[in-house]
Structures are given as structure tokens and as C-alpha cells.
Amino acid sequence: MSTLQDLSKVLSRKQAILDENTAGVEKQKKSGKQTARERIAMLLDGGSFVEQSMLANDTGVVAGSGTVDGRPVYVFAQDFAVMDGAMGAKQAKKIVKVLELARKTGTPVVAMCDSNGARVGEGAAALEAYADVFAHMARLSGVVPMVTMVLGPCVGAAALMAQL
């Protein structure tokens, strides 16, 4: 298979991810809320966002880096349109990746929280996922600036993210 064919497959997969979950997006719009990607676009300088692990879909979080007034920042936004933004192992992995990059580079972090808590179907693994995110956020405290916005229900363990 050629590189162009591989690229075509990746681009097709990316578009499929952007196009899927129209029901969840419509639900967000009806409640007067923006999607995770819209929120990130409102925060960051135009065209500066570089998404991390985009092809790992159904995670319920959009994460990456960009700039605010020309200054670098890492950002993650929980996506309420995907399983009500519930935290699971995949979502935590994307968040932790961004937090680690921020720690290594000394770059500020902006967290946009909008979650109905843990993914109950994952059982203890979902709580472990929260613990991993909390531990990384606590390690960043006093090391890099962090701003957390509560943009939705944020129940249970999700409410603690704003305090870290």
C-alpha cells in the first residue's frame, strides 16, 4: 500500500470521527452548550490547535496544545456529547498524556470539565482512571499554571478536578 493510500485512510478516519455522534452534538446544542472542539476553538488562537490522539475516538475528551495570545498552552475538554463526558481509562490516558507534556515543558494547562462522572461500565478501572488524572494534576500544582473551568454538571469525582 502506498503512503498516499495510507494518508487517505487516516484522513477518512479523521473525518468519520468528526462526523459521528450527531445525536450527542444535537443534544449539546439543544441545551445551549458548545461542543468540546467549539470550546477549544473559542479559547485558542485561530489555527493553533494540534490535537493529540484524535484517532482514539469514543474517549469523550479532546486534548492537545495551542496558543492563547501567542503563548503556548495545553488544553483538554471533556466531551459531554460522548457518553455524557463520563471518565474512563481511554479518556484518562489522553488527559494524562497532555499533563505529562505540560510538566516536561513547563507549559500552562487549561481544563474544560463537563462530565457526569465515571464510566460505570468500566467498574474499578474508571475510578483508577480518575486517580491517575488526580495524581498528575496534583504533581503539577505549583509547577505549572492550571486553570480549570466547570462547564457542565461535573458530578462525583469529576467535581474534584476543579479543586486540583
Write out the residue ranges for each language-model feature.
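Terminal-region recognition feature
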Residues: 1-147, 153, 158-160, 164
